[in-house]
Amino acid sequence: MSERKIPKEVIEEVERLREEIEYHNYRYYVLNDPVITDEEYDKLMRRLIELERMYPELVTPDSPTQRVGGKVLEGFKTVKHSVPMLSLDNTYNEEEILEFDRRVKKTLQEAEVEYVAELKIDGVSIALRYENGKFVLGATRGDGIEGEDVSENVKTVRSIPLRLRKPVTVEVRGEIYMPVDEFKRLNDEREEEGLPPFANPRNAAAGTLRQLNTALVAARRLDSFIYYVVHPENYGLKTQWEALQFLKELGFKVNPHSKLCKNIQEVIDYWREWEERKKELDYWVDGVVVKVNRFDFQRILGETSKAPRWAIAFKFPAEQARTRVLDVTIQVGRTGVLTPVAELEPVQLAGTIVKRASLHNFEYIREKDIRIGDYVFVEKAGGIIPQIVKSIPELRTGSEKEIKPPDKCPVCGGKVGKLDPEEVALRCLNPHCPAKLKRALRTLVSREALDIEGLGEKLIDRLVDAGLVKDIADIFYLTPFDLAQLGPGIGQRTIAKILQEIEEAKKRPLHKLITGLGIPMVGQKTAKILAEHFKSLEAIADASYETLKDIPGIGPEIAKSIVEYFRNPKTREIIEKLKKAGVKLEERVMKLDILKGLTFAVTGTLKNFTREEIVEFFEKLGAKVVNSVSRNTDYLIVGENPGSKYEKAKMLKVKTMSEEEFLEFVRKRAELKGYNFDEIMRSWKEWS
């Protein structure tokens, strides 16, 4: 049987879709400057998936569809590095960095030496190889000589291109890391599932990269920064600074905070600045990497068997403090997981007073040998979450008490145990435990979800304790009489305000409700994807695993979690109660024609919108958004610190307006078409 002939137009469309999707991946994940909406991106991806299903012989390793994961690997092959991946020597003080500078200048016989200062990302070192611009290998550092081939997992990292912007054969190196928000989300999820949390973002990134299930890797949203070109002389590069610009041109994500320093004092100033500012970042850094800028100087300086002599890691001080464990309390999570929490003698740590630290689970307590009364070292995992890293047995007096697992739930007195023998966490097994319900209600009424400000933590506790709320849907059935029963402090005005907020919450956008349901692995971004795709909660509840897993941004692991959540009869009962209470279960489509027929571009930073939000706002009002200014552009919106688009707009005589002028322009156009501008902005804020 002869091979079937694939129509030429299909081959051309597949190639065009791949190029277009990779371009939009680059805009979104590398430049953080998207030019299309999520809905438009999903449409492109769905079309490519459809064509590759029809013509599987067209699937290639560098297709964007290969990023979503789904393979289960048997193991990782060992690969030899083309050039050893050396580690760095460390220094922790300014005197040692000055000594490093003196050694460098003495060897080179130079009065001053230029350095490149780069933030030291707390992640996993990675080597990436490309042939004719196509990704062929991703390998971990390993022992520096050999590493593991983790190519399939690397493909799931959206900021790492599968095709370069130039068809070069090159090997580069960098860091794969886990953003702080993702680290926190993952650890919260692991604790809810009874799994041990990761100690820090580096461990989380390393553990994720070594997963055999690529779908799980894709679900964890790793990111990257690339900073090194192997054999830079092959590309005419003479300095590290030139190499960073070259990496940007190829389409890699390069850390925007790297700095070219004229001398070592500028390096020290840079280190001091980022030691103060590091908490502004959405990734964890533990110091500054200092590199001699010129490659000819690097070759003269050479390296030892372990580390280069032309670079050093200038580490930030460890954020650790010593304190004492006064007591241990136990929290009950939304899924019943019992989390022991150490009550500490207050101690100053990384700019805040720390009084409590999670002990994660009783296995963690046993391994660390932590007791009530112990002196312990506390640090902030990933710079955010206080945790005990070790006890100090040498300081024990004999009065310390062992911390024993409870034999019943501290809240309801119900039976405790494990759902699975592999679990490390204990759970309350009582399905009616009020602590579970309280946590679920806090998620539902939070600002990110239905935003019912009047239902604070204390009031939720009182409602559950009084038996007035038995599941999350019950808050929509509360009456003035119910609230009045809660006793003093709840007056008529407060009751009216709470009921008004609950009534308004019924009209919130669908993605806010989905966020509030607390579906495992479904955060705000995934909730928006689901709402835009299905348009109703009932459609999501009825969706099959096969349908869900193929939606861009969902994937197999999240799909499995969604299906399991809606398979529960109690969930179906809650949806029915929400519907009867008048809670909006459909997505309100905000699509107006106020700016129909107009083309806009944006430059600079806006006050009221992120770049992604302004693109969505234009789309919702019927406008077309472009990334570059041309004679076909009607208006350029100019924010703070505008770029080259502003000069081009002036040259082409394209009309420009400030953000304030733009909003006034929308107001006038809305009124002309019979729309209420304030209502539009209110609806937009609710939706976004």
UniProtKB/Swiss-Prot annotation:
Gene Ontology, cellular component aspect: cytosol
Q: Which Pfam families match?
A: BRCT, DNA_ligase_aden, DNA_ligase_OB, DNA_ligase_ZBD, HHH_2, HHH_5, Nlig-Ia
Keyword Magnesium in record = yes
User: Where does the record place a coiled coil?
Assistant: none
Q: Show the active-site residues.
A: K120 (n6-amp-lysine intermediate)
Its recorded reaction(s) are: NAD(+) + (deoxyribonucleotide)n-3'-hydroxyl + 5'-phospho-(deoxyribonucleotide)m = (deoxyribonucleotide)n+m + AMP + beta-nicotinamide D-nucleotide
Q: Which cofactor is essential here? A: Mg(2+); Mn(2+)
Name the UniProt key words of this record, in alphabetical order.
Answer: DNA damage, DNA repair, DNA replication, Ligase, Magnesium, Manganese, Metal-binding, NAD, Zinc
Where do the BRCT domain residues begin and end?
A: 590-679
Q: Which family does it belong to?
A: Belongs to the NAD-dependent DNA ligase family. LigA subfamily.
Q: Which HAMAP family match?
A: DNA_ligase_A
- From the Swiss-Prot or TrEMBL record, give the protein name: DNA ligase
Source organism per UniProt: Thermotoga petrophila (strain ATCC BAA-488 / DSM 13995 / JCM 10881 / RKU-1)
